[in-house]
Amino acid sequence: VLRIPFMCNLGTKEGVSVTDGRFSKVWPANRSFFQALRSRGGLIGVAVDPLTSHECGNQRYLAIPWLDVCLAARLPNEIGEPLKPMPDRDVWLSDPTGKEAVAASEFEGKKLEAGWLPNGEIAIHWMEYVTDTGVPDVTAPPAPLEVTLDGKRLTWRANADPESGLSQFKI
């Protein structure tokens, strides 16, 4: 379990900045889980959504790239082979409820009390997310396929990637 990457994602109003009320025990429970794993070298981070409580906010903006990086690192080359271990060459660390992350080699605190981030790319997304949840998507959506003009009728087939989606068309 300690070698499996985890990310705890909760809203700030779940006991981080609001410490009473219906969801105030979410952060203490997450903190206990985080500390139990991280103190033993577990690969676990915390991403606090600064805008929400218990509802689903913009978590996907961090979750999708985080999962992409972790899956790309762990999936085997051949079907049936075991999962690969997470690489540790570009790990970044953060205060679990903070807003800044640094390369592990530059981290000055207690590393086994710090939030774990798999690499610099995710650390940048994490810092954007915990600041205002505004993780920009820098990937272009796939180009349309089977574009056909029949008289005045233009048709095409489009595939949306999970990160970019399709917010608009420009013709």
Roles of regions detected by a PLM:
Residues 1-4:
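Primarily recognizes the serine-hydrolase "nucleophile elbow" in alpha/beta-hydrolase
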Residues 9, 35-142:
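C-terminal catalytic histidine-bearing segment of alpha/beta-hydrolase fold enzymes
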Residues 12, 50, 160:
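Residue-level signal for short, function-critical loop segments
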Residues 12-24, 53-54:
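Acidic catalytic loop of the alpha/beta-hydrolase fold
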Residues 22-33, 63-65:
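Well-ordered, non-membrane alpha-helical segments in soluble/globular domains
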Residues 128-166:
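Pro/Thr/Ser/Gly-rich low-complexity, intrinsically disordered linker/stalk tracts
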Residues 169-171:
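Short beta-strand elements bearing conserved aromatic residues within extracellular beta-rich modules
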